[in-house]
C-alpha cells in the first residue's frame, strides 16, 4: 500500500480529472490558455450549443444599430412549428426582441431562435450563411452550421474549443450576462398567455460563481454544456460534449471548474493604474517629465504556489511634445 500512496501523491494534477465524455475543455477566460482538454478539436454534434452563435449574431445586429431590444419581431408559422425545446410562440404576432432573446438564453427555445434568424436575415437559410461566415472570421476551423437551433442535421458540427471561443465572445455583452444568470422568469405572450422560463443551465443555481452558459442535448450529441464561472476576478470557461446524462454533464463541468479554481489563479502582470515608466523625459516640452501607463491591464494565468515567469517589454516611440494626457506614446 505504500507504493499506492506514492503514486497518488505524484500523480499529475490533470490525471485527477476523469471526464468521460466525447470531448471536454477547460480554458482561462482572459488569456484563452487551455488548462485541460480531451478531444477538444474533434468535430461533433453539439445540439443547442449552436445557439451561442445565434445569440452572438443577434447582439452584433443590435450593436450595429440594425435592431434594438425593443424591436418588435413578427413571427411566422415556420418559426412557431419548430418543436423540440420551445416557448410556444404564437404565429403571425409580434414579440419584443428582448423577450425572444431571453427565451433562447434561458429555455433554449428553437421557435424564438428561428424568429430572430428570420427577422435578421429574411430566412433561416440566409442566417446560417451569416453564422458560417462569422465562424470563419473567428477561425473556428472545426465548426459548420446547418441551422440556427442545433436540431439534428447531417452537415452540422462544432468542437469544444470553438464553443469556448464563442462563449468568450458572447460574454462581452452585458445584456447577455444579465439574463444568463437568471434562474426563473416568465415570458408573457402578446395574447397575455404566460410561459414559465427555467434556466436549462442548472449550474447558475447550484454552482457559486457560474453565471452563464448554454446547454444542449439530442440523442446524437448526447448531453452538452458550455459554461462560465468567476471567482476572485478569475474567470473560467468549461465545455463538455457528449455526456451520457443531463446530470453527468453538470457534474463534469463542476469538476472542471473546481479543478481550475483550486489549482490556478490570475495574476495581474501589468496594472494600468501603476506607471510603467515614471518621470519619462519628453523632448521639447514645457512640462519636462510625465508618467507613462499601460493602456489596459495584462493578466497571466499561473498555477497556485508557483511564481509566474515573464518578461515585460515596451517601446516608447511617440513621446514628443505636444502631448496631452491619454495620448498613445508607444
PLM feature segments, named:
Residues 2-161, 165-174:
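Active-site-adjacent loops and short helices of periplasmic peptidoglycan-processing enzymes
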Residues 140-144, 152-157, 161-330:
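Domain-terminus/edge residues, biased toward the C-terminal soluble/receptor-binding domains
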Amino acid at each position: 500500500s505504500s507504493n499506492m500512496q506514492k503514486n497518488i501523491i505524484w500523480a499529475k494534477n490533470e490525471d485527477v480529472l476523469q471526464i468521460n465524455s466525447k470531448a471536454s475543455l477547460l480554458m482561462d477566460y482572459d488569456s484563452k490558455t487551455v488548462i485541460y482538454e480531451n478531444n477538444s478539436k474533434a468535430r461533433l454534434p453539439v445540439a443547442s450549443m449552436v445557439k451561442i452563435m445565434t445569440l452572438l449574431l443577434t447582439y452584433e445586429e443590435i450593436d450595429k444599430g440594425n435592431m434594438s431590444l425593443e424591436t418588435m419581431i413578427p413571427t411566422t408559422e415556420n418559426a412557431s412549428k419548430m418543436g423540440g425545446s420551445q416557448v410556444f410562440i404564437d404565429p403571425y404576432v409580434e414579440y419584443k426582441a428582448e423577450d425572444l432573446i431571453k427565451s433562447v438564453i434561458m429555455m433554449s427555445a428553437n421557435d424564438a431562435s428561428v424568429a430572430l434568424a428570420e427577422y435578421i436575415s429574411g430566412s433561416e437559410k440566409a442566417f446560417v450563411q451569416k453564422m458560417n461566415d462569422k465562424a470563419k472570421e473567428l477561425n473556428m476551423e472545426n465548426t459548420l452550421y446547418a441551422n440556427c437551433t442545433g436540431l439534428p442535421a447531417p452537415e452540422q458540427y462544432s468542437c469544444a474549443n470553438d464553443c469556448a471561443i464563442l462563449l468568450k465572445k458572447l460574454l462581452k455583452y452585458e445584456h447577455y450576462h444579465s439574463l444568463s444568470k437568471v434562474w426563473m422568469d416568465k415570458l408573457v405572450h402578446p395574447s397575455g398567455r404566460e410561459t414559465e422560463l427555467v434556466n436549462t443551465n442548472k449550474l447558475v443555481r447550484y454552482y457559486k460563481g457560474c453565471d452563464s452558459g448554454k446547454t444542449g442535448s439530442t440523442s446524437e450529441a448526447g448531453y452538452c454544456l458550455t459554461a462560465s464561472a468567476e471567482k476572485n476576478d478569475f474567470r473560467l470557461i468549461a465545455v463538455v460534449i457528449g455526456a451520457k446524462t443531463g446530470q453527468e454533464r453538470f457534474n463534469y463541468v463542476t469538476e472542471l471548474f473546481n479543478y481550475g479554481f483550486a489549482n490556478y489563479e490570475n495574476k495581474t502582470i501589468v496594472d494600468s493604474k501603476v506607471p510603467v515608466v515614471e518621470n519619462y523625459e519628453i523632448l521639447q516640452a514645457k512640462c519636462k517629465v510625465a508618467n507613462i501607463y499601460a493602456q489596459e491591464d495584462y493578466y497571466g494565468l499561473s498555477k497556485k504556489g508557483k511564481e509566474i515567469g515573464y518578461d515585460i517589454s515596451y517601446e516608447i516611440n511617440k513621446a514628443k511634445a505636444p502631448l496631452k494626457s491619454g495620448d498613445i506614446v508607444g
